[in-house]
Amino acid sequence: MSSEVRKVEKPWGYELIFAHTESYAGKILHVEAGEALSLQYHEEKDETLYLLYGEYDLTLEVDGELVTRTVHEGEAFRVQPGTRHRMVAGPQGCDIVEVSTPELEDVVRLEDRYGRS
């Protein structure tokens, strides 16, 4: 039995939400070249990100400091609740698979180039 895939437009690209149950969520983030998600953290949401296509710069909080590194196809990272993070797509854009707990609206934005709060 298939489930509905929902497309959600974002200022940086779009999300394809392919699963959202009371236990987990799954989506693909399509980020256009050079576009960025907000610097953010989640109070409850626990997520793992897998880079399917392209590359991106990941800024991730490590021991209280923000560290940035380039992520390449096939790499995965876990982002636990309370961890500040941001993704900026490389010159080809990127597609990221996100698997998480179900709290999709749990986003605390700290900085956002599109003026969202």
Cite the ranges covered by each PLM segment:
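Histidine-centered metal-chelating micro-motifs
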Residues: 36-38, 57, 75-87
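Short, surface-exposed secondary-structure edge patches
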Residues: 28, 48, 68-69
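A generic "binding-loop/recognition-motif" signal
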Residues: 35, 44-45, 83, 92-93, ...
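A short glycine-rich, His/Asp/Glu-containing loop-to-beta-strand
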Residues: 3-45
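Short glycine/proline-enriched turns and hinge-like loops at secondary-structure junctions
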Residues: 41-43, 50-51, 89-92
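Double-stranded beta-helix
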Residues: 3-10, 88-117
